[in-house]
Amino acid sequence: MQAVNYENETSYGNLELLAQQVVEGFITGLHKSPFHGFSVEFAEHRQYNNGDNVKNIDWKLYAKTDKLYSKRFEEETNLRCQFVIDVSSSMYFPEPKNNKLIFSIQAAASLMYLLKKQRDAFGLSLFTDEILLNSPAKSTTLHQKYLFTQLEELLHKPKVNAQTNLSEALHQVAELIHKRSLVIVFSDLFNTQTSIDKTDEFFDALQHLKFNKHEVVVFNVVDKSKEVDFNFENRPYQFIDMETGETIKVHTNQVKENYTAAVSSYRQQIALKCAQYKIDLIDADMNDGFYPVLQSYLIKRQKLG
């Protein structure tokens, strides 16, 4: 599912409806995929462990799957998840009504809906070069409505002229949130590319999160066709840095080879370091829709138990 045009959509209910449709479609699709059986566990069950009360085993589900699952109860909260979303200027690329920020908001809302369905707790942090919002993780319906309202308002705000300070934001989040949380970051990692120092600062912040016993998933949100593959018409362009306002005039055919090589090298460097520090780095091409994001979360959630 692609990102949705929000020009005429203004209420909390529209984002919730989108999230519901995405999650229900995803869960339905699991029955036709290698993840068959996970969807039921995600919604209302968890895998049975030795020592669990046998009265809570769902024997009908056992008959279907040949696996033991316990029914979840309303008060159960097994996971605390903090969503950290980059809302700086570069996230408004490539266009006002279909950009990385809209994709990130809709993807995060879908994950929140899934977490609520699992009765897990979730919070939200929004940042540019500073923390704009930090809401702690809760699992109530009222809390979900509050966060969805915050995200809806963000969808309709005009573009901000703000640079990114991802490293500082992650340092603050590491100290503000409950220990042993799952931290899910949506960012284009724009400012980590500007220098080696910025890249090092980014990984210092990730290590801070790991030191505080958090698990970390970074969704590197991109418009792959343009930002990675540099697929533009072969003609002169004026490119504008969305965070600094700096401009440069180039003929795309003359710079494409060097540009794609530099981007590929940088992405490989980030991937290797994330693997070294046991950080889950996931490419999130906004043109691929939300299901890859949900599937990556599902895999991570299964590893966490």
Where are these regions (language model features)?
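Exposed, interaction-prone extracellular/peripheral surfaces
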Residues: M1-T28, Q47-D52, L61, S70-Q106, ...
